[in-house]
Every structure is written in C-alpha cells, then in structure tokens.
Amino acid sequence: MIPIGNSISWFTGAILVLVACGTDKPVNEVPSEVASKMAAQEAAWNAGDIPSFMDIAYWQDDALLFVGSKGPTYGFEATLNNYLKSYASPEEMGQLRFELLEWKTLGTKHGFLLGRWALDRGDELEDLSGHFTLTWELKPNVGWVIIADHSS
C-alpha cells in the first residue's frame, strides 16, 4: 500500500480483468472487516510499528505478492523486510492516511480494493502519495487478508 517503489506490470492487467468480472454489489461498500483492518494498519503505521502494520492485514505466506517500482516481491517476510529497509526511521515513515475509493466483489471469497495513500513527513522530508490496488481473500479462521498489493 505504501510503495517500496513504482511499477507497471502484467499484474495490473490481470486485476483489471478480474474487476470487470465482479458482481453487482455496490461500489464503495467495503466490507466492515476490510475497512477495520485498513484503519488498524493506518494506526499501526502512525505508531511506528511496521511489523504490526503487516500482521494486521497481509497474508502471512510465501505466496503473498507485492508489486512496486522494483518489480514483484513474493512472500510475507520479504515484503516486511523491504518495508523496514525503505522506512527505517519515524521521519521516513511519516503519518499515513488511506482513502478507500472503490471495492469490487470478485466472487464469494475475493475482493479488489482501489485506494489512495498519503504520507505526511513533516518539514524535513518530501511528502509522498499514490494509489494502491489490493486483492483480498477471505481465509477460513483468519478472515480477510491481502494476497496481492500493487502500490505506486
């Protein structure tokens, strides 16, 4: 959701195809569990806690996909390590704000979330902002988790 970098990939095209196949569920009706997890991630980030930011919503599996400017990263641990390297100080992390723009239901166990992110990093560092697309999956005994994140 916060880029480790920017990238255009086949993943974007695949997601757009999946979105086109969604149901007639109204746009912007983000499931309450997803909205709650996004708010909890925002709070964890703003508390300087990247591990909790990851634990709250990302699928803790080697198949997790994060796409940014450096290309795809696979796996929960690799994605966590990239975040820790890219945002090594509270100043670099700044204060995170999410705006949830559009939810599309993709069957009974998947959804697609389009949103904006912004980092207010004070006077010392340039503020950052961009968009994200998240593919969510409803996992038994876990609930909704992010299985793919494309952030720019």
List the model feature ranges, each with a label.
Residues S129-S152:
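Short beta-strand edge/turn micro-motifs at domain boundaries
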Residues E91, L119-D127:
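Short, cysteine-centered beta-strand-loop-beta hairpins and adjacent loop/turn segments enriched
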Residues I50-T105, K109:
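A solvent-exposed, acidic/Ser-Thr-rich amphipathic alpha-helical stretch
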Residues S9-V19:
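Bacterial N-terminal signal peptides
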Residues Y83-L84, F98-K104, W117-L119, H131-L138:
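Hydrophobic/aromatic beta-strand elements that line small-molecule binding cavities or substrate pockets
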Residues M1-F11:
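Bacterial N-terminal signal peptides that target proteins for export
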Residues T108-W117:
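A short hydrophobic beta-strand element
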Residues C21-S52, I56:
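Short, low-complexity N-terminal intrinsically disordered segments enriched in polar/charged residues
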